[in-house]
């Protein structure tokens, strides 16, 4: 009986509405978006992109073998439409750890659709434009995507966004009212 109660309690906790966490993630994404707006030239992308994914915090670390991951929010028409998970694994010369924020701009409906249908990843040649305090960065679209990043903390002896894979989760029900 005790194990049945434990399973029931964990089941209820696991099935609680996820949108409470989604609300916090959306708030974090909107705050980071404002920081990017004041630190660099992203406004041109905000007005022309079919959509954009904002990852407030991506943690990355490695010692020859490395990995990175984080959660973000997809915006279409300036409104949050779902969450996304990013994962990246790499092998090669790398040492250290860092956290950073990332925004991926989708130039056209085709690349946005690929992202929403989980057919999107940044290839090995993908590069990001780093935005730092007080400096402006000029990013451009490549293959329908522009990526900008901003380091939050840490130092990493390797900096690529290639190989990032994404999984999109649309908001449903009351969570869709963000």
Residue ranges with predicted function:
Residues 21-178:
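Small-residue-enriched, tightly packed secondary-structure blocks
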Residues 6-15:
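Bacterial N-terminal signal peptides
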Residues 16-20:
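Sec/Tat signal peptide C-region and signal peptidase I cleavage site
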Residues 1-4:
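Positively charged n-region of N-terminal signal peptides that target proteins for export
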């Amino acid at each position: 009986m005790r194990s049945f109660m434990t399973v029931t309690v964990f089941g209820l906790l696991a099935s609680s509405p996820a949108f409470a966490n989604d609300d916090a993630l959306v708030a974090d994404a909107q705050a980071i978006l404002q920081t990017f707006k004041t630190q660099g030239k992203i406004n041109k992308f905000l007005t022309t992109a079919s959509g954009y994914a904002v990852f407030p915090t991506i943690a990355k670390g490695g010692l020859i073998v490395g990995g990175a991951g984080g959660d973000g929010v997809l915006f279409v028409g300036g409104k949050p439409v779902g969450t996304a998970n990013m994962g990246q694994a790499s092998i090669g010369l790398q040492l250290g750890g860092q956290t950073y924020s990332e925004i991926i701009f989708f130039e056209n409906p085709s690349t946005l659709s690929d992202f929403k249908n989980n057919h999107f990843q940044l290839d090995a040649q993908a590069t990001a434009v780093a935005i730092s305090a007080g400096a402006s960065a000029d990013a451009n679209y490549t293959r329908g995507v522009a990526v900008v990043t901003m380091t939050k903390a840490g130092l990493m002896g390797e900096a690529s966004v290639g190989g990032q894979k994404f999984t999109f989760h649309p908001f449903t029900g009351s969570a869709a009212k963000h």
